[in-house]
Amino acid sequence: FKTKSLVTKIYTGPSAKPHPGQGSSFFNEGLGQQLGATVNMNLGQVTIWDDNFDVIRQIPTGGGGLFIGTSEHTPFLWADNVLGGPANWNSVHLINKQTLELDRIITVGTTQGTVKDPVTHKTLYKWKVPTVKDAKGKAITPRILHAEPANHGHWTMISEWNCGRIGIYEAKTGKFVKYITGLTTPTFTYSIEHRQTIPG
């Protein structure tokens, strides 16, 4: 920050377009290192790098994403697939920060939401989703993005871009808690503490 000079570049792949916005940083106990992570806008892929800025893992997801989020209160990286097309943009992939493997997938349908194990395909949790319809009366597939941890650590909040609501989920499990409705194109941040800065 003092010299405002380039420190390094992280190569995420020959055709990858990492999103320049919010990434994630977390400590991996097995490696004993602080790791970094980003989604890629045009690929279903989360890129993980170590504290030497070397890429150590490419984790497949459902499609291109914009945001990946975490905090010390959740065991997961929460990666959206909002640019992955209609078949994928209603899911968020939860990656275990210690194993660096996909742990569960949140999917929000037009009438039901699920949290599933990606290996066994077992449904871990499910809930009823209020159907939102367009001007022609057709049910809208929720386009979900930007998992944001609440400051108190109990919840993670996920925007539903085209449905005017935010989904609240348990940070430790991904289990659905409730909706906040009546919003217009919710996209970004909800935790004031995460965006405050101290002048000086």
Model-flagged regions — what are they?
Residues F1-G200:
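Predominantly soluble domains enriched in secretory-pathway, periplasmic, or organellar proteins
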